[in-house]
Amino acid sequence: MEGQDEVSAREQHFHSQVRESTICFLLFAILYIVSYFIIIRYKRKSDEQEDEDAVVNRISLFLSTFTLAVSAGAVLLLPFSIISNEILLAFPHNYYIQWLNGSLIHGLWNLASLFSNLCLFVLMPFAFFFLESEGFAGLKKGIRARILETLVMLLLLALLILGMVWVASALIDSDAASMESLYDLWEFYLPYLYSCISLMGCLLLLLCTPVGLSRMFTVMGQLLVKPAILEDLDEQIYMITLEEEALQRRLHGLSSSVEYNVMELEQELENVKILKTKLERRKKASAWERNLVYPAVMVLLLIETSISVLLVACNILCLLVDETAMPKGTRGPGIGSASLSTFGFVGAALEIILIFYLMVSSVVGFYSLRFFGNFTPKKDDTTMTKIIGNCVSILVLSSALPVMSRTLGITRFDLLGDFGRFNWLGNFYIVLSYNLLFAIMTTLCLIRKFTSAVREELFKALGLHKLHLSDTSRDSETTKPSANGHQKAL
């Protein structure tokens, strides 16, 4: 009987492993397909050139798609775990959800951590160096020569990073950075390096998310139809039509030899056509879309932002009085044992919405920063080098999202796998400072956003607008140059 029980246990374990592997593969396949279509939408079509370059581009495209799929998996990791916990609580003995268990969720967290490290330290550097390589001088040109150069560059990069990490660990803890620890690469240096990358990602989120939370109002205002209050859309369309006709007459009147003026006028005409299309869309929009959807979305964004700041403020108070509020505190109950939200399923749904909202805001804020403005992908006009840079940036942001959500107290779900082993998560001063900075920066960005119009009028009244003390050009409506060269805002 004991032998049969042992065989039965081994068979059950084998079937569980096969089932979990199949589920993980199917989930990743879906994410990979979606990521592939996203990259193809932005990839420049002219990148497909010679046979050798075409092979290099295809390999780089495969690696970039893999990285973007891993990023999407890291974003979905925490929401999937939260909703799985609530489903297991609601249906603990349901036959159709036996595949959903703690082992599967732990496996997903471990795979996300493993693939994030693999993409960040191996695949993306390989894709970049492989794309830029030409082969060493004296060797026969071809794929093998480019692969050899790429591997040499990767080896040199690995030695450089290993040396920097060893020096950094020596400055922090001289005992940990002994010569014997050089042999402990997997257990010490790689987790330490990923912990540093995670901290950098959280700091980048700290910079991008408050900016994105304020920019979300502008972005949604550009996507939705605004109410036409005290505006005559027919007159504006008539004016923009006259401007379009004037530009077309000027364009046809110029000789083809004046290439610079022709290109400038074509770009100006394209901008005018885009503005005309937006005005016609506003005119054709229904009264419900104009007068209800836009205010409702703005109020919803304001509520979500306010709830986020309120949760961070409550988390700051919890950190001051309760040490279990630390992200690296005591482990709570297992998955499916107890609800981690005070309001049950409704609270879990709110946490998931806020996590996605913070991720979207961080991406919007990332591309809104002037330093990363050139990284913004354009449809059918993004080079593979820029795609690789965008994939790395999204990977860093998405990998740090679960850590940031737990650090800010957006959710109480414990970080699983390597995500919960970062050393800095146990530092009270770092965690408290992170929460304080997030709350202060978000509040200041929102105040700056909603008082920009008042500041502009005040600067104009005082005659200070010529000094460019207020930078609201990114949030205001874009002014279009008219046919006579003067600026005209519609």
Swiss-Prot record:
<dbReference type="InterPro" id="IPR006876">
    <property type="entry name" value="LMBR1-like_membr_prot"/>
</dbReference>
<feature type="transmembrane region" description="Helical">
    <location>
        <begin position="427"/>
        <end position="447"/>
    </location>
</feature>
<comment type="function">
    <text>Putative membrane receptor.</text>
</comment>
<dbReference type="InterPro" id="IPR008075">
    <property type="entry name" value="LIMR"/>
</dbReference>
<feature type="transmembrane region" description="Helical">
    <location>
        <begin position="20"/>
        <end position="40"/>
    </location>
</feature>
<keyword id="KW-1133">Transmembrane helix</keyword>
<feature type="topological domain" description="Extracellular">
    <location>
        <begin position="173"/>
        <end position="187"/>
    </location>
</feature>
<feature type="transmembrane region" description="Helical">
    <location>
        <begin position="188"/>
        <end position="208"/>
    </location>
</feature>
<feature type="transmembrane region" description="Helical">
    <location>
        <begin position="292"/>
        <end position="312"/>
    </location>
</feature>
<comment type="similarity">
    <text>Belongs to the LIMR family.</text>
</comment>
<feature type="topological domain" description="Extracellular">
    <location>
        <begin position="313"/>
        <end position="339"/>
    </location>
</feature>
<feature type="topological domain" description="Cytoplasmic">
    <location>
        <begin position="209"/>
        <end position="291"/>
    </location>
</feature>
<keyword id="KW-0472">Membrane</keyword>
<keyword id="KW-0812">Transmembrane</keyword>
<feature type="transmembrane region" description="Helical">
    <location>
        <begin position="111"/>
        <end position="131"/>
    </location>
</feature>
<dbReference type="GO" id="GO:0035116">
    <property type="term" value="P:embryonic hindlimb morphogenesis"/>
</dbReference>
<feature type="topological domain" description="Extracellular">
    <location>
        <begin position="1"/>
        <end position="19"/>
    </location>
</feature>
<keyword id="KW-0675">Receptor</keyword>
<dbReference type="Pfam" id="PF04791">
    <property type="entry name" value="LMBR1"/>
</dbReference>
<dbReference type="GO" id="GO:0016020">
    <property type="term" value="C:membrane"/>
</dbReference>
<feature type="topological domain" description="Cytoplasmic">
    <location>
        <begin position="132"/>
        <end position="151"/>
    </location>
</feature>
<feature type="topological domain" description="Cytoplasmic">
    <location>
        <begin position="361"/>
        <end position="383"/>
    </location>
</feature>
<feature type="transmembrane region" description="Helical">
    <location>
        <begin position="152"/>
        <end position="172"/>
    </location>
</feature>
<feature type="transmembrane region" description="Helical">
    <location>
        <begin position="340"/>
        <end position="360"/>
    </location>
</feature>
<dbReference type="GO" id="GO:0042733">
    <property type="term" value="P:embryonic digit morphogenesis"/>
</dbReference>
<feature type="topological domain" description="Cytoplasmic">
    <location>
        <begin position="448"/>
        <end position="490"/>
    </location>
</feature>
<feature type="topological domain" description="Extracellular">
    <location>
        <begin position="84"/>
        <end position="110"/>
    </location>
</feature>
<keyword id="KW-0175">Coiled coil</keyword>
<feature type="coiled-coil region">
    <location>
        <begin position="256"/>
        <end position="287"/>
    </location>
</feature>
<feature type="transmembrane region" description="Helical">
    <location>
        <begin position="384"/>
        <end position="404"/>
    </location>
</feature>
<feature type="topological domain" description="Extracellular">
    <location>
        <begin position="405"/>
        <end position="426"/>
    </location>
</feature>
<feature type="topological domain" description="Cytoplasmic">
    <location>
        <begin position="41"/>
        <end position="62"/>
    </location>
</feature>
<protein>
    <recommendedName>
        <fullName>Limb region 1 protein</fullName>
    </recommendedName>
</protein>
<feature type="transmembrane region" description="Helical">
    <location>
        <begin position="63"/>
        <end position="83"/>
    </location>
</feature>
